[in-house]
Structures are given as C-alpha cells and as structure tokens.
Amino acid sequence: MANSAANSAQPNRFFGTEIEYGISSPDNPDVSPILTSTQAVLAFAHEQEEGLSGRIRWDYAPESPLRDSRGFDLRRYHQPPIVDPNAVGAANLLVQNGARFYVDHAHPEYSSPETATAREAVIADRAGDKIMLRAAQLAAEATDAEGNPGPVLKLYRNNVDGKGASYGAHENYLFSRETEFDDIVAGLTPFFVTRQVFTGAGRVGLGQIGQESGFQISQRADYIETEVSLETTLNRGIINTRDEPHADSNRFRRLHVIIGDANMSEVATFLKLGTTGLVIDAIEDGVRFDDLQLRNPVEAVHKVSRDLTCTEKLQLADHVTWMSAVEMQYEYLRRVESYDQQGDVVKLWREVLDVLADDPRKAAHLLDWVAKYNLMEGLRTRLGAGWDHPKLALIDIQYSDIDPARGLYHALVRRGSMRTLVTEEEVDRAVEYAPESSRAYVRGGILRRFGKDVVAGSWTSLVVDTSGVYRRTRDVESPGITLAYITLDEVDRFTAAECGDVLESAETVAEVVEHLRTLGAVREQ
C-alpha cells in the first residue's frame, strides 16, 4: 500500500459546495418557484451591482455539463447559449465573495467559491445561507412597476419537498486527470454508501414520496437508483461522472458528488468534505479499497439510511464478509488517517464514529439526523403519535429554515445544544470577501473593487473593460471600450499572496489587469 503522501506535502485539495435551496412563498403558495427564485437572485443582484442597467453576464463558453468522465460527450450543441441574465428562470450572478448565485431549475442555488481546506469550505458554505437570507429580505422589500410589494420568501436547506421531488446539495473536489476514474469509483462507492451515518440530514417518510411512515437518516438515499451515472435529476448514481473541471482539463477532473444531503450542522459539513478529500488523497496515492466493495451498493444506500441503530451489516462483494456502516467508516479512517496533515478531520471523524458505535442518539449535539430525530421522538412521545403525524413533518421543514429567528437548528445552536466550528465573524467576512487561498480571490476581488468594469465572468474567466467607458455606458458596443480577457484555469493561482497587494491598492482595473498579464492570465485577442 502506497503511503508517500503521509510523509510529503500534499497539494491543496480544493473544495466547493452547491446548495439548491427549497423555496416557498407563504402568502402566495401557488406562485411558481421559478419566478420566486428569479426574484430572489435579481433582488440581490440589484443591491450588489447598485442597480446597474447592464448586468454582468455569466460566460457559458467554458461549460461542458454533458461531458462524461468515462470518455464520451453528450453535448447537443457546441456553441455557448446566449442567455439574458435577467430572464425568469435564467437569472445568474457572480458574487463578490467569489461565488455564483443563480436559478437552477426551480430553485435558487448558491455555488460556493473554491476553498483549500474543509474548514474554509464550511465558512464559505455558511456564507451562502446569509446571502440567500439577504436575497429573500431584498425581494420582500422590492416593489413592482405598479407599486405592489415583493413576495415574502422562505428558504430551506433541505433536499425533498415531500411530494416526490428531490433537489441537490452537491460537493466538488478537484483531482488529477492522471488518476484512473475506475479507481475513484472503486474507492468512493463503499465510502459514500456508508458515510450517511454522519452526513445524513434526517427525514420523515420512507420512499420518494414518503409513502411509508417512518424516519430515516438521509434525505437523498431514496433517490439514488444506480451505481454510476451522468444524470443529476433522474436515474441518480452513487458516483456522478460529469467531467467538467472548471480548470485546466489536461491536468484536472472535478469530482461532482450528488449523493449528499444539505446539512445545517457544521460538524456534518466539515466531515462530509474533509473525509472525502482524505479518501481521494489516498486513492491518488495508490491506496486500494477493492476488498471493501459491496455486493449491492444501491440497496445498501437504502439500508444504511433506514438503520437508525447504525449496526445492520452489509454484505461485501466477496459474499463472505459483512460490515456495518460504522465499521466500514472505521476501516476507511484507518487507511487514510496518515493523509490528514493537520489532524483535525481525523480527530473529529473518530470522535463521531465512537459516539455512533456507542449510541447514535448521543450524537444529537453533532449531527443533523440525530438532532432532528430526538426532537421528533420527544414530540411523538408526548403526543402518543405515529411517524405520520403532520407535526413531525413540520419539524422536518422547520429544522432546515435558514432564518436564525425561526429555524429549529438555529434554536439548538442558541441553546448550546449543537456544536459549531466557525465564528459568525468569519462567516460575515466570507459574505463580503472571497477566500484568499484560491483563484476566487481575484474573481471576487475584482468584482468587489471594480464591479462596474466587469462585463462577464465564470469560474475560469473574467471579461473586463480597462478604458472606463463601460462603467458609464453599460454597453459593450460603445466606442473606445478595451476588453481584457482574464483566464483563471489554475485554481491554486491568483491568490491573496500572489495578487493581494496590487488588487487592494490599485486605483483602476487596468492596473490589476497589467499585474495579471505578468502572471500569464490575460488572453490577448
């Protein structure tokens, strides 16, 4: 078993999250969520861009969502679409903290900026809740052309609507293109199946439409239908094969993980990202997990989610060995712990597994599903009710309410009943400023300081006007405009260490562009 990474410096494992929020309008329950999601994004855009008449456009040219890691491409066209960033269902925004905020299907989605540690990722992820909450407040304060008030919006960090629909809480991990994708599948499938014991958000109802009464660990489990798939909205797989790195495609792939739940718990989010990163480190270093393959992984996903004792055994592919989800996680921990150079992920991982092995209900201060279960079980006992009681479904949704004044998770935090890992000050700063450890620093910093000069952008590009004309006219066809095309293919470049002095002291965006030109980031047209 290889172990070189345990004794040498590992390159940063860049992380990112994508949360599709549940959305409702209590005063108008029949209104289209596509419309309300658009209203939320545009309200936030109006504030960030100071009411500019010409919105910053999302640059779709680098995107390839139908390219598959198994070597084929399902793209139906090869020209990027021309999309109005204000259109209903298509509202799209680059945020000054380096994130993307847009409408995805019928949900407002926050895609966090790239971060270099799991803790940074938790901070950036939590900043998304505050941005969403601000967007909802701004939408409610807005008025339409006739002077009618905007909608009251409620936003939830969950994955199911109770009517059969599921929406995503996706994770992203950059890894080397030299790594065989089959090794990724083999190494991560048993891990993803069993990590539910600490990543689950908890759910009332069994089956996709909750057709059976009961409680289960994961909100996402019933929607996993196959082992490997490119799809994210149907026939969902344990492993998603999308090959869209948003980086140098000759060097990197991006592992797009769709099996996870939307967590409120910072411990769960930290472990979800940190442990997965360590397993990828080990896979890239040659560690094998062939002996941990499950006989029926999809069935095991459902079985683990419904085992509230965390003790039910899963049959491995050798037809002889049986392991519980917690036992499987202990084995993963043993094989990858030497890759955790800081030791913080492994320490918390072991603590949580020890509690789950003793008595899962003792993990209520750490994990969403246990906290939610204990709240519901207490109410169920007082009412003498079954799991189909409507008040339990109400707790399910209220737990995930991102409004600190109303959400049950936030009430537990205020009471000291949930462990947190980051400070409110860190999260507040992450709303305004991009992480300093990745290219997000330049993307967000240019938006923060020179947003009026930005014409378009994406994860890997920015188009800015260095003449000063665009900030006055908001018309890219105006005479005298001089466009600079900034390429940000290298995720670990253009950090605060590399660009901070110039970016923060520059008086014009042209000065920043000149600095980036010396770093090879400006593409000449």
Positions of the model-derived regions?
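Non-catalytic regulatory/linker segments of enzymes
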Residues: 151, 162, 167, 185-186
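Long, low-complexity hydrophobic alpha-helices enriched in A/L/V/I and glycine
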Residues: 167, 221, 228-230
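Terminal catalytic/cofactor-binding subdomain
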Residues: 1-151, 155-156, 189-201, 206, ...
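Helical (often loop-to-helix) elements that flank the catalytic cores of nucleotide-handling enzymes
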Residues: 173-196
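Histidine-centered divalent-metal-coordination microenvironment in nucleic-acid enzymes
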Residues: 159-176
